[in-house]
Every structure is written in C-alpha cells, then in structure tokens.
Amino acid sequence: MTPVPGEVDLLVVGAGPTGLFAAYYAGFRGMSVAVVDALPEPGGQVTAMYPEKMIYDVAGFPEVRGRDLVDALVRQAAQYDPVYLLGRHAEKLSEVEGGLLVDVGERESVRAGAVLVTAGIGEFTPRPLPAADDWLGRGVVHFIPELGAHSGQDVVVVGGGDSAFDWALALHPVARSVTLVHRRARFRAHAGLVDKVRGLGVPLITDAEVAEIRGDDAGPHEVELALAGDRRQVLPAQAVVAALGFTADLGPIESWGLELEKRTIRVDSTMRTSRERVYAAGDVAAYPGKVKLIATGFGEAATAVNNIAVALNPEAHLFPGHSSNMG
C-alpha cells in the first residue's frame, strides 16, 4: 500500500476523470497533490463500469475507449507525481490550524491545505438480478472489463436503460449473438441509442423477466424468460449482463457538514462548498443549470483548482496564463 504523505497542498477525493484532471492541473499550478479513492485503481466509474465502452462527448476525441481516456489522464498527471491512495476511504474531516485533516483509514490521516471532492455518484452498488444470484461472477456480470472474453458467445443483456443498450452495442461485433431483455414495454434509454441497437438486428424482448439461468460448472447454458400471459421462452446464453443500474451514496462524505442536495454537494461559482477550504467538481457538484458530463467536470476541476490556488496563497493569480505560452 502506498505510504500516506503527511501533508499536501491539495487532497483530491475521487480518482475518476475529473479527479485525475484536477490532480494534473493542481500540479501544473505548483501544488503537491494526493488522490484518495475507495477503488483499487484509478478511473472511477469509467474503469469499474465501462472500461471497454466508447465515449463520444470528450472534447478533441471523436471517440475514445473508457480505459484509454483514463490511461491518458493518468499519464498527463504523472508529470507532477501525485500520490495515489487507492483502496482507501476519505473518512472523518476535521479542521486544523492552517488547513484540514482527513482520515484515510488504517489509522492514518492526510493534512491538506484544501480538499477537492470529485467523488462522482459516490460509492455505488449494482442492483441485483434475483434469478442470477447463484451465477454472479461465473457467467453473470454487471460490468464487462474485457469485451474479448465474450467472443463467440451468446450473450443476454438485461435492462432498459442507456447502460444496457451501450453493452448490447459494444458486444455486437464480438459475440455470436446478443439479445436484450427488459421487463417493461418502454425503454429508459435514449431513443437514438435504441434505434441504433435495433438497426443492428439485435432482438429486443420486452415485458419479460429472467426466471431461471441453467448451466453447469463451466457456466450458464441458457436463460429462461417469463413473458406476459404466463408464456416462457428459452434463450441460449453463455453470459448474462445484468445492466439494471445501481444504488449510490456519498458514504462518509455525508457527515462532513456540507450542504447537500440529493446526494450531490452544493457549490458556488468558484466550486467552493458550504465549508471553507472544501471544494467539489464533477458529477458530485451541484449548482443551477448543472449538466453532468465528463467534459463539464474537466472545466469545473480547473475552476476549482485555480480558486484553491488563490485561497492557499492570496498573492497567486487566479488566471495562471495559457499553458501554450509556458513551453
């Protein structure tokens, strides 16, 4: 486990794309940085939930694979040597003279001039597929870390939201067959995404639930669906993707005395929270007109870091100049 630094200028809570860019930008502004995250590797939801999916709304990239975006952000930040405290929680927050003290588990703490919360949706737990409990981890998954593992397989995707359709779209080129099953007649996914998957000829079975998964020690062989009117349908399946969404909460951050709004943190135009020296950016930050995008998070990270630079050193300039003039 990485040694915990005794003191840094900025502690970033959350190692998703926004947190990684904040780590880079804080280094660019001359700050020492530590990044704490409960997950075992950087990337946040992108790494944990959709490393193989293509992302289409990051500036400068017509498309970019999730894991490739994370790798690029880690490389960008590496030039300033941020300290990664992975597999740890940011627990108790307390004020000390000239800064903040954050407990990071294992009876260890980090003293920081400021804290930037980039925790995304917080700690997330996938919603279970009841009929799949006995198969979880051996044929039934919530997220796909490697698409190639499903090459030549019959895959059943369960869900009706964007995530389910994203997985169907990603699996289509590699799997032998992909079938999407949803328990309702209407989908929550974006209409354009539904049309794209339907246009590929992927069967979309609605008003259906997974009744049973059958197989052997090698894994699933087939999925039995319960349809309307007490009908049944059996699909071949060597893999099932349960894309049913997830539950999330902010964990210990909820006890930090910040002004919260539906599991997000209220911020002002400088990205400062209701507590001095504590800032927030990315999906976890809330303000009027907020749009939750990775691209938005990058801008919020820069806004937060520049204002933190001035908060820590009143003689610093809010605007650091254009990076293109500093080569």
UniProtKB/Swiss-Prot annotation:
* Listed cofactors: FAD
The chemistry this enzyme catalyses reads: 2 reduced [2Fe-2S]-[ferredoxin] + NADP(+) + H(+) = 2 oxidized [2Fe-2S]-[ferredoxin] + NADPH
Q: What is its EC number?
A: 1.18.1.2
In Pfam terms, one family for this protein is Pyr_redox_2
| SUPFAM superfamilies for the chain | FAD/NAD(P)-binding domain (SSF51905)
Where does this protein hold FAD? T18, D37, Q45, Y50, A90, F124, D283, S324
InterPro entries in UniProt? FAD/NAD-bd_sf (IPR036188), FAD/NAD-binding_dom (IPR023753), Fd--NADP_Rdtase_type_2 (IPR022890), Ferredoxin-NADP_redctase_2 (IPR050097)
Top enzyme class, one word, equals: oxidoreductase
User: How is the cofactor bound here?
Assistant: Binds 1 FAD per subunit.
User: Cross-referenced HAMAP family, in alphabetical order?
Assistant: FENR2
PANTHER family, sorted: THIOREDOXIN REDUCTASE 1-RELATED-RELATED
Q: How does it assemble?
A: Homodimer.
Sequence similarity: Belongs to the ferredoxin--NADP reductase type 2 family.
**Name of the protein described by the UniProt record:** Ferredoxin--NADP reductase
Q: Which organism is it from?
A: Saccharopolyspora erythraea (strain ATCC 11635 / DSM 40517 / JCM 4748 / NBRC 13426 / NCIMB 8594 / NRRL 2338)
